[in-house]
């Protein structure tokens, strides 16, 4: 039997990481939709805080088992990341409340150009013409699928602007911190999850009350709703971990482009489980365009010159690089 090459092994791990993210992301969307629409649990920010609290417990278990090794992340970097991440969560929730669904979807699509800009400015990344065109094709396809009514107001635009930039910065920072401080996905999540859990569980109930005029402590918790909350938190562990793994192995732009496959899958599963309402020709055409764009992007960005860094490297030491290479591969292969 021929030995498996390093490239083949990397491709297999990349595919596994991506499938892990797709399955957990689509799963948590469906569970949260049932929790909020069927059982009336409309406290999205508090629920996210519970997600990170559960993820924190997972990182503590992994630390005890030896999967997470001691590592260092400066407090200023952690604080900056938490600000970006929490503004992203709050901004998305507020944007959805203040904007039409159509403008909310356009705002989400604009994260790809913003992520491209961040990589071009900070990482000196250069994209080929085919890579740029493939990204555009994905945006067109997903836009055709999801964008319907589009109305804009000032406060909604501000909320969307904050949400888009903070989300793009948070995802860029995941990749940046892993490279600069030689942190694998487990290490970084071990640093960030406790801080996000603490801040969101403090801010979340007040923000949710402002958005919904309902108090989280007055919700009618019953066995079924608690089971759904528990299931949502359990799946969120995989969602949070797989996001860090994917962005660490790829880039924020690739994560965003390929991430729209989840949008397509959610639409398809929605039609499958909840009937054919909304399934029409332009939605099907949009799905086909988006998938073709993703295939084109994967091919174009992998070619020489498709996406390359121009003589730029982060200030990591040789010792950090050697330690990160072995530690990251070992831990993420185990995941």
UniProtKB/Swiss-Prot annotation:
Record PTM Phosphoserine, positions in chain: 326, 328
Designated name of the protein: UDP-rhamnose/UDP-galactose transporter 6
Pfam families in the record: TPT
Keyword presence, Transferase: no
Keywords attached to this entry: Antiport, Golgi apparatus, Membrane, Phosphoprotein, Sugar transport, Transmembrane, Transmembrane helix, Transport
Organism: Arabidopsis thaliana (Mouse-ear cress)
GO molecular function, one term: antiporter activity
Similarity comment: Belongs to the TPT transporter family. TPT (TC 2.A.7.9) subfamily.
Topology class, membrane: Multi-pass membrane protein
